[in-house]
Every structure is written in structure tokens, then in C-alpha cells.
Curated annotation (Swiss-Prot):
Organism: Mus musculus (Mouse)
Encoding gene per record: Abcc10
Catalytic function, reaction form: ATP + H2O + xenobioticSide 1 = ADP + phosphate + xenobioticSide 2; an S-substituted glutathione(in) + ATP + H2O = an S-substituted glutathione(out) + ADP + phosphate + H(+); 17beta-estradiol 17-O-(beta-D-glucuronate)(in) + ATP + H2O = 17beta-estradiol 17-O-(beta-D-glucuronate)(out) + ADP + phosphate + H(+); leukotriene C4(in) + ATP + H2O = leukotriene C4(out) + ADP + phosphate + H(+)
Consequence of gene disruption: Deficient mice exhibit increased sensitivity to paclitaxel-induced mortality associated with weight loss, decreased white blood cell, and small spleen and thymus cortex due to apoptosis and/or depopulation of lymphoid cells.
Assigned keywords, A-Z: ATP-binding, Cell membrane, Lipid transport, Membrane, Nucleotide-binding, Phosphoprotein, Repeat, Translocase, Transmembrane, Transmembrane helix, Transport
Tissue: Expressed in all tissues tested including liver, brain, heart, skeletal muscle, kidney and spleen.
Topology relative to the membrane: Multi-pass membrane protein
Protein name, entry field: ATP-binding cassette sub-family C member 10
Subcellular location: Cell membrane; Basolateral cell membrane; Basal cell membrane
Amino acid sequence: MEGLLAQLCGTDAARPLPLWEGDTTGHCFTQLVLSALPHALLAVLSACHLGTPRTTNHSPALNPGWRLRLAASFLLSIFPLLDLLPVVLPPGSRPGPLWLEVLAGCVTAVAWFTHSLALWALVHSPHGRSRGPLALALAAFLPTPALVLTLLWHCQRGTFLPPLLPGPLGRVCLLILQLAAVLAYGLGWAAPGGPQEPWTHDPFLSSESQETEVAEDGESWLSRFSYAWLAPLLARGVRGELQQPRDTCRLPRRLHPAFLARVFQAHWKEGAQLWRALYRAFGCCYLALGLLKMVGTMLGFSGPLLLSLLVGFLEEGQEPLSHGLLYVLGLAGGTVISAVLQNQYGYEVRKVTLQARVAVLSTLYRKALKLGPSRPPTGEVLNLLGTDSERLLNFAGSFHEAWGLPLQLAITLYLLYQQVGMAFLAGLVLALLLVPVNKVIATRIMASNQEMLRHKDARVKLMTELLSGIRVIKFFRWEQALGDRVKACRTKELGRLRVIKYLDAACVYLWAALPVVICITIFITYVLMGHQLTATKVFTALALVRMLILPLNNFPWVINGLLESKVSLDRIQRFLDLPSYSPEAYYSPDPPAEPSTALELHEALFSWDPIGASQKTFISHLQVKKGMLVGIVGKVGCGKSSLLAAITGELHRLCGWVAVSELSKGFGLATQEPWIQCATIRDNILFGKTFDAQLYREVLEACALNDDLSILPAGDQTEVGEKGVTLSGGQRARIALARAVYQEKALYLLDDPLAAVDADVANHLLHRCILGVLSHTTRLLCTHRTEYLERADVVLLMEAGQLVRTGPPSEILPLVQAVPTAWAEKEQVATSGQSPSVCDLERTTEEELEVEQSTCGCLVQEESKSEGAVALHVYRAYWRAMGSGLAAAILVSLLLMQATRNGADWWLAHWLSQLKAGRNGSREDPASCSPGSTALFSPRLLLFSPGNLYTPLLSTPLHKAASNGTADVHFYLIVYATIAGVNSLCTLLRAVLFAAGALQAAASLHHRLLHRLLMAPVTFYDSTPSGRVLNRFSSDVACVDDSLPFLLNILLANSVGLLGLLAVLGSGLPWLLLLLPPLSFVYYSVQGYYRASFRELRRLGSLTWSPLYSHLADTLAGLPVLRAAGATYRFEEENQRLLELNQRCQFASYATMQWLDIRLQLMGAAVVSAIAGIALVQHQQGLANPGLVGLVLSYALSLTGLLSGLVSSFTQTEAMMVSVERLEEYSCDVPQEPHSQPLQSPHQQRISWLTQGSVEFQDVVLVYRPGLPNALDGVTFRVEPGEKLGIVGRTGSGKSSLFLVLFRLLEPNAGRVLLDNVDTSQLELAELRSQLAVIPQEPFLFSGTIRENLDPQGLHEDRALWQALEQCHLSEVAVAMGGLDGELGERGQNLSLGQRQLLCLARALLTDAKILCIDEATASVDQKTDQLLQQTICKRFANKTVLTIAHRLNTILNSDRVLVLQAGRVVELDSPSALRNQPHSLFQQLLQSSQQGAHSGPSGC
């Protein structure tokens, strides 16, 4: 080094870089240190700003300051080039050493030219309104002292004295001009600039506070490299201010969902391959990151190479100190640069992953909006959103590793070959033997993954259905039966997961034991070939083998990640390839031929499943004129709803054509099962349309909602809960109708909106709404209540999926074979004096109306979020779930594994020390530098020279060496191999035990969660959106199954690895222990500062997943309605808004991870440099043992990654433990039904204690919540065994509350209920409900066969099942579906709503319960079938006690007594005839009101 400096500066070799020359600084020192280095720094900082993003606004006008700085920078880049002209002058006229001036001039020119470009970029960025980054301006002024000192140096040399030479004189003039330009630059910088404008982006959250945001856009590259822009976010995390997603960072424009959706849609079209579209949209940027990966990988080899040189330097002691310093500096520099590059690579890959993630999730949701009739189950779609999308995007982290790891492997093998020659082949062969084993394992893992995902789909789908029907499940005490079905799916899922985990354990064992086995093989081979082991070769080989193991160890995971990505890609692609809803292809491009026609169908054949055996709907010809009211009638399952679905495009059109006038305006659709959003009543009615007060009032009046709103806590601002859980069936139907009416469409399709309301309300809806507000529109009305179709213009008669008759009501209605029409009923009433046979009272579910509602109308509260560190009890819960004995065994096996690994390495170091002591001073490598050498570079740095390729071959002797020192080689090898064998066994034990523990924890946590939720009261489900529960059963359970064990395994391995490393460092370099306290403090402070924010970000990320799940499930449930209303774009915007909230949390999490990583990497580089420096000092003092120092340095190289991995894995494990925390929250904190005991099998229940069937309420009081009125207020009555009791009352009177108290779905606040004089509060819930039966109004079916839905508990023979189906007139339907094993589809979608109700009635016929509760379950069947069913019920339950809530009064006229409720109190109780004959009785008033509602309407209508 000294010689090169002397040659460059033209000075004496003894003083190559003099600081002083006379009265001024040395010219060479000035040019190299004071000029070249500051200019190099200026160039680097300027280059960091070249990529500063431009503003989206027009380019701002340059103010004078920026102009002056740009001009000065450009001139300062020209002047040094002119200064190079003396190169062509004769030597005598040159102003200084030639190459010194050339080097200094080139560096200066490049620096200022780069600075000019950086200034130009900053002008067009948000910095253009200010002076720009201060650090950049300061760097521009750093070289100024060098200019002044150079000018003084020329003055000292007499440049201005004769004779005046052109070279020196011109250079002085240029120096003066440069000083003037620097002064101009300073004036330009000092000129005032405007305030800096904030970086603009595509805003979605317009209401967010700009003061709390941080953003990456507009930041300098220095800030980006150091992640300094995250400081405000981290500070908020420490202060505990990260409470909601809006508290996180603002998204960069390139990560904003709206921007990414536009970018991706430009490359995506229907039917395209997803991976091609992703590649076109983001592939170029992603592939470019491969260059960064390659450079970082190459620099990663600087550690082992420089370790080899440094250990050789310490061992031989013949090189100059400058070489040792150079090795230490190279080790530090290479580690730092590699860390920065690898960190930036990881950060940019994560950003690309986020971009692709938004594109995939947006595309999945957009496809969900376009799904045709053959759509997959909701649970499967939710799995695509959560599990499969995440697995697919793991490809981004695996692809570059897939080629980077083989490259790293090849370089490592070459370097290993340089160290040990052909002996490396023994280890290579051993490693290659595992490749086919790995292939077999990977294939099995892929196959098991596919099966596991199928079982997971089934489990999530079943959970979705279970949550939707939880009330019916509790009525029928099916918690055990359906819980067992979920457990069966979970068992199958865990069976596949068990295969995956044990195969993973085999991989872990093979690759964890491989380093020691390879080292043994190589060293034994090397010794047997006659070579002598040295510290240099051994520890360099150890470091290289560790680097060799990294790609070999990671390669199975990389391949596994790629395979999982492929599986998930195929699943997503199959979903995207499903037929889409396409109005352009479905409807005729031309409107109906006649302008007066609103709708026309001709020779049209429709089907729910084009390739299945589902019933077809055929319409030979149908023409509907504008403004007509068309009634549609027919038996249950005849195809009425299918006809409306065919008109809206929800069926497959197999042939014919459909023409709709004004198709672009959409339809007003009110479905048979009302779809209600989890929002306020007003929001449900507006449905995204602008609020019009006049229209809104008209709609409320027309839909008879004013009275309902008057009794709700917050009027139309009352939240209705998920799926309208707080509303009655009639209220849901009217709100759905009001939503359709408010949209002001030209064509309305109304699917039996009158079925769930009483006669008064039905009459009101008919005259005020259907014949009133909608009188100017075209209306198609399906109904079983034919008395309301007498005002229709045309009536359509459907039978077996075909339109068989069309005509006026007078012709069609008599053919329906219904109960006598209204005119006939009038005559019957007049002659017999009896009440009308068709009278309706609306059923109101009071507990749903009032449960969990506060005075502000808020029902669903925001999801709770824990704060601070994950509590210790969460870790204890996971420990208990894993099993205390198993968990302790895992820790012991880990400690033994690390102890034996350290023991093997220590024994190797001890062996080498003995070899060195026994050697006679000879060296195996003759190529060494003499002690007096002053060469700058060691020749051994040329590791990749062509000659080195042959050196190991030439140094391999053809015969075995006579001796390998005085040590007993065989003894040391045997001991080393024994320790390695024990290490291998401990590694195997650890892998197997951990796999078993992870499986045990996964099974236990899911079982506890499921059992707790099955035992939760219905009030919990009323106030908890199903998305929250499904999020736990999907994402959180998936995390516990896979991500958490993976990260916990890494954390434990890193922890024991750090203990072993510290032990080695302490034994080899005791002075290093002095650094541990401050180092530990720094690491603890950094990770504590980081964890405070990261864990909250992970929690927020989990919270923002739930709304995405709920929104998708809600969209799938209401797809026909929102498509008919043309609201798909608004729902897509809402999905983007929710996705942005989640994206913000994900981006902030990734950025904080990289913030931590770069700091840990740099601190680790500093520690490695300190260790190398201490080793160098000990060597100078003669205290270094090359064997121990080599061992310490080989371990120290892994210190950076180990410490970084430890903190990162601990933080990520803590983040994954948030999933355990969320599962434990529901497993421990969810309220439970009283006296909930472990569920018994139905075969193990006790002998029935209910023998008679009497029911008695004694002063029962029920309050849903403090501050709300009593739902039941001192109710007292008795029902005798076998008595038939009808229950009537107006809305909110407390009818349904009686059933809830009877079944103990709600506990009374006072009073008691007796069954056969037994207090129900003293009975177990399962025992109580086993003696009761219920027929609910809303049918609940789940995926499975007819047999499973009829008899989930498997208590009845097939003969009994067929008999029940026959009595309910469903036997023909069952035969057509394939018998009792016919599949019903998700939620019974293969049946019509009326058929579903009949199937639920068949369940009740199978029961042996003494008490039957009927909540009018025949509203959706035709009247003839209704009559037959009533006869069946009377016959089947003739000797049973029957309680019937009257929805239609004809169902209770034959009751023994009628109970009349008002405001939660019993006001009347007597026989129907007695109450009817009592003057001014409430029952008589209800009858009169019903009679008027059925037969008359407001005048003028």
C-alpha cells in the first residue's frame, strides 16, 4: 500500500502521504482525502436522489435559487474536465503528479455531474417547492476547503512568478472559477423557497388525518435505505397510538388498490391465465430485483473468503500488519454492503408481493360479482380469499431463491474445492444423494396439501352454514351432531397436516444434521488422502459448509413454497374460469319489438345447472306489457322463483331468447329470502342512492315501516345486525321491498313479499305500494296468497317448471285449487258467522328486535383488539395446548442438539491445536509473503484466478503421507464422529417431537374454540358478525396450523444457537464478553422499540381481514339483488376501501420488519468487525490461538444473521401468537349458556322425565338489556297435557320470547318455567331441549344429504324418514333427487324455499317430544298444501302439547285455547269461540282487522 501511494503521489515510500508540506497541507493528502473522498460522498448521495418520484402536477416553474444551483453544478462538472488538459503537456509543465490529478479531476467531474442530475430530479419532485434535502446541500460544500488549500499550494509553489507556464497558470484560473461557482451555488441554496407540498396520491380515505400519516413517496433515497421515514409511525407505536388502520402509514401510490386495480386490469381479460397477467403487470419490476439478489449473494461470500485469509494471517504470522487490517476492513465492508443489498431486495420483493396481492384479491372479488348460477360454496370462496391468495403470493419469495440457491451452491462448492481439493466430492455426493429423497418428500407434501385444502374448504363451508343456522341448531340440540361433522372435517384436515408435518420434520432432520455429517465426510476423506489439516482449511471449510447447508436447507422449503403456490394458483384459476354472468350474452341485444312491451321471452329454456339433473324452466312465450301487474302462482317447487331468476339472468339460458326494455336501468328485485346488510335501516333502504327526503317518506309509508321505526331504539338509524338478525321476518321483507322501491326502476320482480306479514300489512303493501307507488311500473308478483291477485292484469300458472296457462285472474285463480277466494269467503262468513280462513298476523321476533341494541341503535360493536405485548397467559395457553411434557421434551432435545453441535466444533478446534503443537514448523502452503513485504494486496486475495482451479489437484499427493503429526488421527476422528452421531440423533428427536407438538396444539386449540362457540348463547351471535368468527376458523387456525410452528421452530433454533455461539465466543475471545452488556442493551432497546409497533400492526392486520371476509360473504349472499340494482361498482369500491385498510397494515408491517433488519444487520457487521479487530490485537500480542480464534470467527460470521434472525423470528412469532391470542379470546371470554356441560351423545341421554307435557309460566319477566322495556312482564299461564294453545299478539307483544324462554335460549330475569312441574332452570340444556320440538318459520338446511338434514343425529331408520317425507308431500322430490342420499347443496339451495320449509316440518314429524312449538312454518307453501299439512300436524301430534304462534289465524282457530299477548303481558286466555264472542276483546279486534285487511282496501285504490 505504501509503495502504491508513493507512486501515485510522487513521494518517498517512507512517507507516501505527508500531511504537511511546508506551511500548508500536503498536496496528495488534499487531493485524495480532502477532495476525492468528499466528492465521492457527494456522488453517492446525489445518486440516491436520482430516482426521486415526480409530482403528479405539472412541472413547477424554476425559482432563481434552483436555476443558480443547476447552472453552478453543471459548470463545476465541466471545470475539472478542462483541468485534465495538462495531461497532454510535457512533463515539465504539469502542475502536479499526473495520475493524482487525473484521479482527482475525474472524481470531481463525475460527482458534480451526478449532482446536476439529482438537482434536476428534485426540481420536479415535491422538494421543488423547498431547498431540497439539507444533507445533499451540506455534501456539496464539503469539498470547498480542498479548493482553497489547492489554491494556497499553488501560491506556495510560485505559480504566479515568472516564467509563467500555461499548465499551472490555467489551473489556478480554473480553481478561481470553481470557487466562484461554489459561491454561486451557496447563494442559490440560500435563496428562499416555497413551502413543501405534500405528496399526492389516489385518496380513498378522504377523512383521514394528514398530521398522523407518514409516507414513503417523496422521501430521499438515504431515508429509504435507512427507513427513517418510518420514525413517526414507530413513535406512535411506542406511545400506544396505533389503534386503528388509519393510524398507520399512508400507502405509496404504487401500492394503492385503486391504482393497482387499473394497472392490472390493463393486462387482464376474462378467461386469461392469471400468472400471465401478473407477469405482464409486475413481472419486469420483479425480475429486475434478481440482479440485486445476485449482487447481494455474491457479496455474501466475502465473509468466508476473508475469514480464510484472516485465519491464515493469524496462523502463519508472516504477513505484514497492513494485510490483516485490510482483511478486517474488507470483512466489515463486505458484510455492510451485502446487508444493505439483501435488505433492499427483501423490501422490494415484499412490495411487489403486496402489489400482486391486491391484484389477486381485487380480481377474486370482481369475479365473485360476476359468478353465474353454478357458483362454488361460500366457504370455498372465502378460502380462496384468505389461504390460497397468501400461498400463491409466496411465489414471489421463492422464485428468486429457486435460481439463487443453486448459484450459491455452485460458488460454495468451488470455494470448498479450493480449500480441500477433491475431498469435497465426498460431501457433495452425500448431499446429492438427498436430492431424490427430497423429490419424493416434495411430491408427497404437494399431494397432501391438495387434500388438506379440500378438507379445509369443507370445514369452513360447514362453519359458515352452522353460523347462519345457530338458532335452529340450539332449538334442536344439534350442537353435538354438527360439531361432530366439523370435527370430522378437522380430523381429515389434521390427518393430511400430520403427513405434511412429519415430512417437514424429515426435511428438517436431514438438512440440520447434514452440516456435521458433510464435515466429517470431508475431513476424513481429506486426512485419508494424506493431507494435513490446518486451522485455515478447517474453519474456512466449516464456514463454507454452513453456507452450503443454507441453500440445501432452504431448497426444500423453496420447492415446497413453489408447489403450494402452484396448487393455489390452480384453485384460483379454476374459480376465475367459472362461467360469468354476462348480460350482453344472456339478453337479446335488441329490445322487444313492440315499444309497449316491457319483457318478452320466447322458446326459452333455463336451468340452475346446465349439465346436472336439476329441474328445467321452459317458457314457450311470455310477453308483458309496460305498466302491467302480473301474478305468478303454482304449487311449491313449480318454478315461480326460477322464472324471476331467469328474468334477472341468474339461471343458465340453454336456448331461446330474453328481451327486456330499458335493461340498462336494471330491475327492482325483492327476493323470497330477504337479503339485509349489516347496516342501519336507512342505509339498507337507500342502498347507495342519494337521500331524497320526499321519496324516502313515500317509500316508508308505502312499505308500512313507520310504525316499526317508531318503536325501534334509534328509528331508521338502528343497526339491524348481520343478515338483519334484529328484525322480524316481516320487517326484513318490507325493508327489502322498500330498498327495491327506492331505486325507482321500470321493472319490478317481487317474490312473495306478502308471505311474512299479517293481513293488515299485506293489504297495505298491496294498495299503497304495489298498486300505489309502483302503479306506473311493470310488476311481476309471485305469491301463494291468491286473494291478493284479483287486481292483477294477468296471472301466470306454473307447473313442473313450465308456464302452462296465462290469463286474467277470473280464469286462472279457480284452477289453483286454493282456499276459497275472498268473495267466497265473504259469503261463508256471512252464512256461518265464522272468521275468515285466511287471516294474517305478522310475527315479530322481539328478542331479535331488542337484543344488544343501545339507545343509539348500535348493535354490532367494533372488534376488540388487545394492546401491548402478547400476554404471558397466551404463551401458557399454547404450552398447555401442546402438552407440558411434550413441550419440555422439545426444549431438552433442542439444548442437547446445540450442545453436541458445539461439542463437535470444540473437539475439532482442540484437535487442530494439538496438530499445531505437534508440527515441526513446516507449512503445507508454500505461497506466503515474507514478513518484510510491503505489498498492498495479498496474492491470496486472487481466489478466482484460473491458476487456483488446478492448485488443489496439483497439491494432491499420489501416495498417503507418512504421518499426520503426533496426534492420534483415528482417535480424534472417532470421537468427532461419535459426537456428530449423537447430534444427529438429537436433531431427529427434536424434529419429530416438534412436529408432534405442533399437531397437538393445532388440534387442541381448534377443539376448544369450536366447543366454546357451540356453547355460546344466541345473543353472542346476534352481536358478532360471522366474518369475525370465520376469520378465526380460517386465517387464525391456518396460522396456528402452519405459520406459527414454522416461526416458533426457527425462534427456538436461533435461541439455542445464540447460547452456543456465546459460549464459543466467551471461550475463544474472553475480552469479547465485555461487549455483551452494551450490545445486549442496544439489541433489547431496538427490538423493544420495534415490537411495540409491529405487534399492533399485526393485530390491526388481523382485524382488517374480518371486514373483507364479511363483505365477500355478504356480497355472495346478495348477489342477485345487487346485480339487479346495478350496484356492483359501488360494492367493488367498498371492497377496495376495505382492501386499502388491510394493505396499509400489511405495508406498515413489512416496512417495520425491514427497518429492524437493516439495523440488526449493521450492528451485526459492527460486532463481526470488532471480533476480527480483537483477534488481530491478540495476534499482535502473541495471545491468539489460531484454532480457537478460527472457531470464534467462523461462528462470528453467523452472528449477524443469527441475531437478526432471533429478533425477527421472535417478533414474527409474537405476531403469529396474536392468532393464538384471538383464538383464546373466544375460547375463554365468549359467554356460555348456563349449566353448559359436555355434550352427550343422543344415545346416552337419560330416560325421559317428561311424560305428560304440561307447560307452566309463573311470573316470568324477561329483559334483554338494562334500560330496555320488559319483553315479558309477569307472564303467567298454564297449558295442560295434550292441549293445543294458539299464541297471538301484535308486533312486539312477546310471542317469540315465550319460545326462547321455554327453550332457555334466553334466561328469564324473574319467575320460572315448569314442565310437568319440573323447574327448567334446574335441568341441563341438552336434556331440556331433547324433550321439546320446534318448527321454525325460517328453514335451516346445511350441505349434505336429505338423510343428514332430516336426522343429523342418526336416530331413525330409513322407513321412518320416508314416512315423514310422504306426510310432507316431499317423497316425489326426494326420489327425483336420488333418494335419501340426494345432495341438497349449500343451505339447501337445490330446493325451493317452500320445499325447504316442508323438509323442516318433516324433521318435527320424526320427533317423540311431548311438546311441539310451531312458529308458523307454512307461509311459503301454496294453500292446498298448507291445508294438508295442517291436517298432518293435527293427526301426528293429536296427543302432544302444541304451542302455535299464529301467523295466519286459520292455523289456530281449531286450538283448544288462545293466548293473547300485549306489551309482554297476558291479556286474554280462553277458547277461540269464547274470545271471538267477547265484546271489545283484543282477539276480536285482531280478527276484525284481519277480515278488513283481507277483503277491503283504502278507498280510491
